Structures are given as C-alpha cells and as structure tokens.
Amino acid sequence: MKKYVGLLLLLTMFSVGYAQENVVKHWEYDINGKNGIACRYVQARNLLFMSGFSVADNDVFYFAGGKPLSVVCFKGTKKVYQRVIDELPTKLSMFKVVKDSVYLVNDQNLTLYRMHKSGQGPVDKVKLNIGKLRPCEGAMQESGFVLIQRIGQPLHANYKATYFNDSGRLIKEEDIENKDNVMCNSSECKKILDSYLYPSAKLVFPDFDGNYKGTWNGYNIFWGLFGNSGKASWTLAFADKDGKVAKRYDINYHLNDMYDVIPLPVLTNDIDPETFTTAPTYCMLHGENLYILGYSGAKKKIILCRINLLNAFNSEQSAK
C-alpha cells in the first residue's frame, strides 16, 4: 500500500512538472557582456532597465537597451549581432520589429531609428517634430507610434497625444483633457493615458489586474495578477468578445516564490531616481505564444519566458 501511495505521488509530481514544462519555457542570457544582452543594470539596487524587446518567428528575439544604446539579436540563446545605434539611453520603452525593419524611438533626443532586422546596412535617423516638451509616456503601435506630453502642473496636468507614422511623419495631435482633475501619479491617470497608448478589450474578471495582449483562436488574451484572500497567481485569461473568461491558466505563488516561474519583470520607464515602472510591452503575444521579459539578480541573468497558449488552454491544472 505504501509503495502504491508513493508511486502515485511520484506520478502526480511528474505530471505536474511535465505539464508546466509543456506550457512554460525559459531562455537565460547574461546581463551585458560579450554574449549577453545590453541593458542598464544597477546591481546595488537590483534595478534592470531595458529599452524594449520584440519577437520574430523561429525563436528569433530582438532586444534594445544599454548605454550606449544597442540593438541585440538572438536566435534562441545564440547571439547573432549587437549594434550600437545611439550614445544616449532611453527613459521610455518604444521598440518594435515590423516586416524587415527594426524601429526604436529615443524619447531623450526625440529621434526615430530604423534599420534592417538583419543588422546590416545603414541606420536611418529621423528627428521628430514635437517641439521642446519632453514626452512623459509613449508606445509603439501596430502602425506608427504615439508620444504623450504633460502640459501644466505635474499634480493636475492636461496632456497632448502626438501620433506619428513609421517614417516619423507627424499624423495628428489630440488633446487629453483632465476633466476630473486627477493627480498625474494616480492609477486613474494611468488608465486614461494607457487608453491612448495600448489596445484594450472588455474583461469581466473580479480580483484580476492585468493587460489585454491581443487575440488568439477567437479569444481575447489577458495577462496579469490574480489575487484574493484565498489565492495569488500569475494568470493567463482567455475571454470571449463579451469579456467573459472561458478559460484561465494560473501559476500560483506565495510571496517568497512569486518570481520562481515567472521572472521579475524588467523596468522600462525611468521616471526619476526613485520612480521606475514597467510598461505592458514587457509582455507580448506572438503567434501561438506569450513572451515575458524579466530578470534575476541572484542568477545575474536576463530571462525570457514563453507560455504556449494552446498547451495552457488545454491544461487541466495550474503550473504550481
């Protein structure tokens, strides 16, 4: 009987581990260095800043970061190239790969950079026509990109959204009126600005805090944190067009192991010496997979995590 119970426990542990391995995969990279990813890392405070990342087919990954600002390409964990494109690091993350081109906007000198994704050829530079104000937010979009400027006093400001195409030509400007006079550093203000920066979809999911990542197989995909008095998890939600969750995949955690499976997200927005945030672009949907960029100070590694949507959808259990 004891042997039977022991065997059953072993098989259960194996099936859970296999199920997680079938859903979640990791790649690890050095922080900076000849074979690593260029970034800005403050080891004493365990702060790691990236200027962006993107994914192409066949496990080809593109990263931007560091000082000087570089674009780095990997095939899996094999480095393909690293190319310096600017001496000045970014304070925001605005980076994408579309068709055969890599695009990066440096918010510090208001310049759009474009180069071939092979790393070969010239780097085109376009100075943006946005005036003297520095953008406080920005994001790449499916076509073009948007920068947001703060106008007025920091605590109760209005904003202006400026839209550009992928050639760096100004398309339109839109005033964002702070009708409710919300504070600039509040969650309400963030929601207002995010509505101009990132696509969204309806979701009815109490106790969930996350972001819309795109569509897959007829479902709207959301990624974020779920938490109530009985449970805490990283959660992948599959929702229908009405926002109802049809399926969810949970990676349960306790406070001491929150980043065991899903790594600590990289920082993207360097607002001031004491304020750092992570834009939703640290996590992106590509094809059949969700990719999440993070790091481990203990391991001294940048970690790219991939969640296979089909296997997560078909899974009958959580990852932990």
Residue positions per predicted region:
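Coil residues (strongly favoring Ser/Thr
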Residues: 19, 60, 87, 100-101, ...
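Bacterial Sec-dependent signal peptides at the C-terminal "C-region" and cleavage site
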Residues: 15-21
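Short beta-strand elements that form the blades of beta-propeller/WD-repeat-like
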Residues: 47-65, 96-106, 142-154, 187-199, ...
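Sec-dependent N-terminal signal peptides
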Residues: 4-14
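Blade-level signature of beta-propeller repeat domains, shared across WD40, Kelch, NHL, RCC1
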Residues: 281-320
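Post-signal peptide N-terminal segment of secreted/secretory-pathway proteins
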Residues: 55-101
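Repeated scaffold domains used in trafficking and secretory/extracellular systems
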Residues: 36-53, 89-99, 130-142, 177-188, ...
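Surface-exposed loop/turn elements that mediate protein-protein interactions on large endomembrane-trafficking
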Residues: 21-38, 66-84, 110-129, 158-206, ...
